[in-house]
Curated annotation (Swiss-Prot):
One of its GO terms (biological process) is glycogen biosynthetic process. One of its GO terms (molecular function) is alpha-1,4-glucan glucosyltransferase (ADP-glucose donor) activity. It comes from Bacillus licheniformis (strain ATCC 14580 / DSM 13 / JCM 2505 / CCUG 7422 / NBRC 12200 / NCIMB 9375 / NCTC 10341 / NRRL NRS-1264 / Gibson 46). It holds the Pfam family Glyco_transf_5. InterPro entries: Glyco_trans_1, GS/SS, Starch_synth_cat_dom. This is Glycogen synthase. Keywords: Glycogen biosynthesis, Glycosyltransferase, Transferase.
Length: 484
């Protein structure tokens, strides 16, 4: 079986969010299952220079962008048993950020068609083309509407994964012709039209043979108006080919027993290193070094979606009622960045914030934390809680999306559960759950069992990769759609 991953970002090359982690880890796991997996992505100037120097030009192709024709270089790099092809176009991809440019519609129209042209240039006859989020949704659409008419592409199946439905790639209707090179018949409600514009995410959904989301609960949520982002009708029409497959993390990369970024290593059986890491991070941030004070952390974008408005409502109360410390790492909305700067000043022995992102520091924080707070308004899957489980930072989460699928509430009567959860997006429900978690922290023997359950929870890609393998196989064979 041959599978092509078409992605807009991928670790270890470039990353802006969780999509890059999936693109970096899942192909490796599929390769271990004997699937020939190739990844295609843009050759951004943001990729480290030493990595770009190792790329080898292997082919080139011409790509239609509306009425124009653009040159595309194709460069190859082998990494961790996976072949990566980087599609090169200096004007589109030599930018100071991955996204957020005035011509993103054109950039990813080019990339989507370039992916299909590059397949032919490389003579790579993929059985399945697997695309991700709006940036590559037009790959699925162009394959179905145009390229499958050519013998080289006619047997190829396509899968489209929704990582976050909130970001859809919406552009003026002129893009149908001027960027995608399609005629106006594609601007209908049954095709690309979306409230007077065109929608790349919608195109990927309607054209793919299979659509997946990054958790089973998120799959069900996006069929409702609350989570559906005005695409719930389109998704409902596709629900027989809509599957939720839970993301994992790279458990070799995220391993407290071997992580080069942390000061002391440990595992689920011997957690003495975790205690030492806590003292290191308390000292680093200028907090009182005290093992008996529970340390809570948040590593996230500082946005309302991540629940920071809930934090803002009750953090004062928590500091007044509980002996606890909080470390926050992230950037985001100015309202929350300024709030945590104020809280650092108001509670210098309780609250510290690093406004920015620093991967090695984030690992140190996970390894030091007793609790990890993630009260998201919605969360398609979530990466933070998976890393937290792996590092023994017991998650406190809202029951939504992938948080619901990965964190189970601790039950005192049975000893089951790997974290603490609350259902409603409500500040005082969150506060009550945090206080409950803190009460168990001081019962050392019981707390040790909770931490061990967290650390032994399987967060790897192994099971999910087998589910994708099954999905691909069933689609290639033309069998029933939804995985049961």
């Amino acid at each position: 079986m041959k599978v092509l991953f078409a992605v807009s970002e991928c670790v270890p090359f470039v990353k802006s969010g969780g999509l890059a982690d999936v693109a970096g880890a899942l192909p490796k796991e599929l390769a271990l299952l004997g699937i020939e997996t190739v990844v295609m992505m843009p050759k951004y100037s943001l990729i480290a220079e030493d990595v770009r120097r190792r790329m080898v030009k292997t082919a080139e192709c011409e790509v239609r962008v509306g009425w124009r024709r653009q040159f595309c270089g194709i460069e190859h790099l082998e990494h961790d048993g996976v072949s990566y092809y980087f599609l090169d176009h200096g004007y589109y991809f030599n930018r100071d950020s991955l996204y957020g440019h005035y011509d993103d519609g054109e950039r990813f129209a080019f990339f989507s068609r370039a992916v299909l042209e590059a397949l032919y240039a490389l003579n790579f006859e993929a059985d399945v083309i697997h695309t991700h989020d709006w940036h590559t949704g037009m790959v699925n659409y162009l394959l179905k509407e145009e390229y499958r008419k050519k013998p080289f592409y006619q047997h190829m199946k396509s899968v489209f994964t929704i990582h976050n439905l909130q970001f859809q790639g919406i552009f003026p209707k002129e893009a149908v012709h001027d960027l995608l090179g399609l005629d106006i018949s594609h601007f209908t409600t049954e095709k690309l039209e979306f409230y007077g514009n065109i929608n790349y995410m919608k195109g990927g959904i309607i054209a793919a043979d299979q659509v997946t989301t990054v958790s089973p609960t998120y799959r069900d949520e996006i069929l409702t108006p609350y989570y559906g982002e005005r695409l719930e009708g389109v998704l409902s029409d596709k629900k027989d080919a809509l599957t939720g497959i839970l993301n994992g993390i790279d458990d070799v990369l995220y391993d407290p027993l071997n992580d080069p970024h942390i000061d002391y290593h440990y595992d689920a059986v011997n957690r003495d290193g975790k205690r030492k890491n806590k003292a290191v991070i308390q000292k680093t941030f200028g907090l009182p070094v005290n093992e008996d004070i529970p340390l809570i952390s948040m590593v996230a974008r500082l946005t309302k979606q991540k629940g920071f408005d809930l934090i803002k409502r009750v953090l004062h109360e928590l500091f007044e009622e509980e002996d606890m410390q909080l470390i926050v790492l992230g950037t985001g909305e100015a309202e929350f960045e300024n709030y945590f700067r104020y809280m650092e000043h108001a509670f210098p022995d309780r609250c510290k914030a690093y406004i920015g992102f620093h991967e090695p520091l984030s690992r140190k924080i996970y390894a030091a934390s007793d609790l990890f707070l993630m009260p998201s308004k919605f969360e398609p899957c979530g990466l933070g809680q998976l890393i937290a489980l792996r590092y023994g930072a017991v998650p406190v989460v809202r029951e939504t999306g992938g948080l619901h699928d990965t964190v189970t509430a601790y039950r005192e009567t049975t000893g089951e559960g790997n974290g603490f959860t609350f259902a409603h997006f409500n500040a005082h429900d969150m506060k009550h759950t945090i206080k409950r978690a803190l009460s168990f922290y001081h019962r050392k023997e019981e707390w040790g069992r909770i931490v061990q359950k967290a650390m032994t929870h399987d967060v790897s890609w192994a099971l999910s990769a087998r589910q994708y393998q099954r999905l691909y196989s069933r689609e290639i064979k033309g069998e029933a759609h939804v995985l049961k």
